[in-house]
């Protein structure tokens, strides 16, 4: 789990210029240095650990979590961690309706799958060069926008967002559907939009990497807990069944004994 040293080394305490702040973040600010707001890392650490547990527990309950972060500093890092733990993600551009009109998004994913099937079967080679080029361009575009959500069969139970100010459409859709939002909260962000905020820098690459890493580890830990629960439940089930059969045999023996004694 994250430490104060991690937060300092990754520059999580650096907020935005004072003229760009959101007054609602005042409670998370420690002070000002060279016109830059400094975030209170004691509060960051407390919120970080609390949110880590929230995400871990959600994962342990089998809930799905989507990663969202499309800005330049975040997109590659977010994709790396999302793919490493096999969760859906959006790292290029958020398409309107990705949550609120999910059925349409699924249709677009299906188009991508059909084009890939055409490639694999060789059917695409039967087209003219112009037609083939157009279809391959379509595939490239679909994969860029939807590659991270192509295996997502339903809307997520929670979303983890890098920069809620930039990802305002994703945040608005999640709030409309009452999907909990987890996010680092920089000094220019509105804390009222985030269910589980972590006060911190959402612009520096090292800080973003730390947030992605910790949320990924929370999800993995939750999966391990869920697996342990399943194994434990199976063991208990087998034990109960064994004891139950033994009791039945003992009762049957007693009944047979009573019958024999009665016959005598």
UniProtKB/Swiss-Prot annotation:
Belongs to the universal ribosomal protein uS2 family. One of its GO terms (biological process) is translation. Keywords: Ribonucleoprotein, Ribosomal protein. Gene3D superfamilies: Glucose-6-phosphate isomerase like protein, domain 1, Helix hairpin bin. One of its GO terms (cellular component) is cytosolic small ribosomal subunit. This is Small ribosomal subunit protein uS2. One of its GO terms (molecular function) is structural constituent of ribosome. InterPro entries: Ribosomal_uS2, Ribosomal_uS2_bac/mit/plastid, Ribosomal_uS2_CS, Ribosomal_uS2_flav_dom_sf. The gene is rpsB. SUPFAM superfamilies: Ribosomal protein S2. It comes from Helicobacter pylori (strain P12). PANTHER family: 30S RIBOSOMAL PROTEIN S2 PROKARYOTIC AND ORGANELLAR, SMALL RIBOSOMAL SUBUNIT PROTEIN US2M.
């Amino acid at each position: 789990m994250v430490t104060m040293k991690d937060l300092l080394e990754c520059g999580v305490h650096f907020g935005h210029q004072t003229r760009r702040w959101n007054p609602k973040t005042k409670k998370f600010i420690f002070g000002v240095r060279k016109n830059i707001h400094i975030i209170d890392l004691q509060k960051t650490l407390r919120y970080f650990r609390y949110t880590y547990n929230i995400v871990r527990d959600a994962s342990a309950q089998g809930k799905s979590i989507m990663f969202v972060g499309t800005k330049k500093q975040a997109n590659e890092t977010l994709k790396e961690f999302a793919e490493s733990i096999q969760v859906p993600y959006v790292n290029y551009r958020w398409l309107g309706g990705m949550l609120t009109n999910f059925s349409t998004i699924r249709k677009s994913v299906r188009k991508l799958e059909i084009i890939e099937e055409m490639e694999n079967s060789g059917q695409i080679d039967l087209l003219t060069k112009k037609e083939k080029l157009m279809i391959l361009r379509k595939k490239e575009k679909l994969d860029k926008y939807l590659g991270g959500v192509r295996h997502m069969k339903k809307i997520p139970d929670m979303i983890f967002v890098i920069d809620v100010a930039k990802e305002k459409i994703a945040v608005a859709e999640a709030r409309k559907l009452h999907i909990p939002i987890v996010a680092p909260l920089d000094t220019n962000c509105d804390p009222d939009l985030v269910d589980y905020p972590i006060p911190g820098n959402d612009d520096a690459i090292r800080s973003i990497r730390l947030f992605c890493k910790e949320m990924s580890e929370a999800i993995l830990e939750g999966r391990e807990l869920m697996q342990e629960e399943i194994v434990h439940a199976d063991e208990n089930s087998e034990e109960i069944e064994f004891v139950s059969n033994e009791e039945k045999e003992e009762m049957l023996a007693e009944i047979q004994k009573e019958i024999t004694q009665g016959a005598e």
